Amino acid sequence: MTYCIGIKTNEGLVFASDSRTNAGLDNVNIYSKMFTHDVGDRTIVMVTSGNLGTSQAVYKSVEKDLKSSSGILNLNTCKDFEQIASYVGSLNIKHSSPQGINTDNVLLGSTFIIGGQIKGQKPELYLIYPQGNYIRPADSKPYLVIGEVKYGKPILDRVIKPDVSIGDASRCALISMDSTLKSDLTVGPPIDFAIYKKDENKLASLKCLSLDDEDYSKVCLSLIHISEPTRPTPI
């Protein structure tokens, strides 16, 4: 299993993904589930959950298309993020079910969160399903989660609004990830973490965080402090 987060605020975007893959108790490995493309007039971040083979095949196809000189559609030639979402969705179908959309898409497909900004356009965030279709998050809840979502979602519901600061959104993403790490052994570190600030056309931060990383530890320690019960006020 896995857990990935994408948050969109008025100030920018935040992404987080764990790195654990689990094919049984005796087959646990670490693979990055984040892909970044920060070139020219566009910044793009993708995170994924689902079938590892399909996810890796999609990422490899994206990289291959970027290197191609034949003028085929790729992340650099897409005109907007909706076309990018459609492009990644078509690759998802291609690698999970070459014969077309069927039940194999559910068994072998992957789910992606993709977001970023093309210069001159607004920042965007999309969820791409195994069947290749896609959606944007609701304006009232501008975030997307995939994978093992039940442990980390409550804090996002409480905190994430369009006007939340990029700093608070980042802290909230780490708290959400930490809640999931502590509750589900199929989700594990290191954590790939990316921050994009609106109209900067480059990633403000891209880190691979371990549990003893200073930035991550500060957030977790603040949680412990907040969770300490307050003593009743004497009458």
Predicted regions and their residues:
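Glycine/small-residue-rich interface belts in oligomeric ring/scaffold proteins
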Residues: A16-L66, S70
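Flexible, glycine/charged-enriched surface loops at secondary-structure junctions
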Residues: L73-N76, P98-N105, I166-S170, T180-F193
